[in-house]
Structures are given as C-alpha cells and as structure tokens.
Amino acid sequence: MGTARFLSAVLLLSVLLMVTFPALLSAEYHDGRVDICSLPSDSGDCLRFFEMWYFDGTTCTKFVYGGYGGNGNRFPTEKACMKRCVKA
C-alpha cells in the first residue's frame, strides 16, 4: 500500500507542476516576486459561477471564476483590479 500512495503523490505533484509551470513562465517578475497582473486569466478548477475581474495587460476584463484554484490575477471588482494593476 505504501508504494501506491507514493506513486499517487508523485502523479499529483507532476500534474500540479504541469499546470503551474507554464503560468509562471508567462509571468513577469519584479524584485524576485511574480507580478500577478501579468498572469493569464484562470477560471480555476471548479464549475461554480463567480463574476470576477482580471488584468489583460491593458485593462481590467470580466471573466467567470469557478471558485477554486486559479491564480492571483483575480479581483472581486473592476475597481480593485484597476487599483492593483493599472499604472497611473
């Protein structure tokens, strides 16, 4: 049973890396930290329906968030998105 658990853990880690790594490659970094406003929109892993906002590189755009997962480029309001991502 121990081998099966180990293989399951390795498989889960592999899937998480395959999902996360491309998003990190597309992100911009400032002072060694990911700039969340440069991440792509990500609706997450669930099928719920929440209207959220993300920064598309130019402006804040509405999208549907599933309720779990995703990345930091997700804001509850357009105002919150603009405040965080739009440079004055």
Swiss-Prot record:
InterPro entries: Kunitz_BPTI, Kunitz_BPTI_sf, TFPI/VKTCI-like. The record marks 47-48 as: Reactive bond for chymotrypsin. It holds the Pfam family Kunitz_BPTI. Residues 1-27 form the signal peptide. Residues 28-33 form a propeptide. Keywords: Disulfide bond, Protease inhibitor, Secreted, Serine protease inhibitor, Signal. Disulfide bonds join 37-85, 60-81. GO terms for molecular function: potassium channel regulator activity; serine-type endopeptidase inhibitor activity; toxin activity. It is found in: Secreted. The record marks 39 as: May bind Kv1. GO terms for biological process: envenomation resulting in negative regulation of voltage-gated potassium channel activity in another organism. Residues 37-85 form the BPTI/Kunitz inhibitor domain. Expressed by the venom gland. GO terms for cellular component: extracellular space. Serine protease inhibitor that inhibits trypsin at a molar ratio of 1:1. Belongs to the venom Kunitz-type family. 03 (sub-Kunitz) subfamily. PANTHER family: KUNITZ-TYPE PROTEASE INHIBITOR-RELATED, TISSUE FACTOR PATHWAY INHIBITOR. This is Kunitz-type U15-theraphotoxin-Hs1d.
